[in-house]
Amino acid sequence: DYTNPEAMTWWHGLQQHVFDLGIDGWKLDGTATLFWSNLGPIPMFYKKTYAGLMTTRTYMDHYYRDEYQHALTQNPEFATLSRAMDRGFHPEGFAPIDASPVNWVGDQEHKWITDEMIAGTGKDKIDIAMDGIEGFESAIKSILKSASSGYNIIGSDVAGFSGKTIPPRLYIRWTQFSAFCGLFMNGGHGERRLWKRSAEELEIIRQYSWLHTELVPYMYH
């Protein structure tokens, strides 16, 4: 409970061991765990906290801001990686812009298209908010939407987060796109060890990884 002073004193004490190592940032995910219920991934909309009755949204904003503001007292250049706007509804919500210096949008599958899949009928028509049938196309849209809303450094899981097999062409194309995003994050399911993938993928992804590194001074300054 991030509103409980005693709990936060204990938690910040645990974090101090990591701060003392000199880390520069970490990823914030699973923001609504205090609100989880027997409804599965959908959290309760209200819950009694130490500070009183709070909405899921209010509590998550409190969580994001506490993590970021406390971290800045330990390292003035600390950055938290938080979720920007990636769906109309998401059980984890979105981070407030003032406490989200670095952002990702998720969780896409290892697929190319979105609209054509959603437009299907019958068993092919799946609720995107709950089952996550998203792809490369939706990552691009979410990044642009987040940027237009005021989020700054934004990216996505290269080739998507969910699935067993990453198509080679998709891995290459998503990498090329991500090289020009503020965040280049090669995370998620599927084979990510590039030396286990094709020689073509290894060479192209290496080139664009270096290109992204060369662009860092331009992107951040």
Language model segments and positions:
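Catalytic-domain carbohydrate-binding cleft regions of carbohydrate-active enzymes
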Residues: 1-221
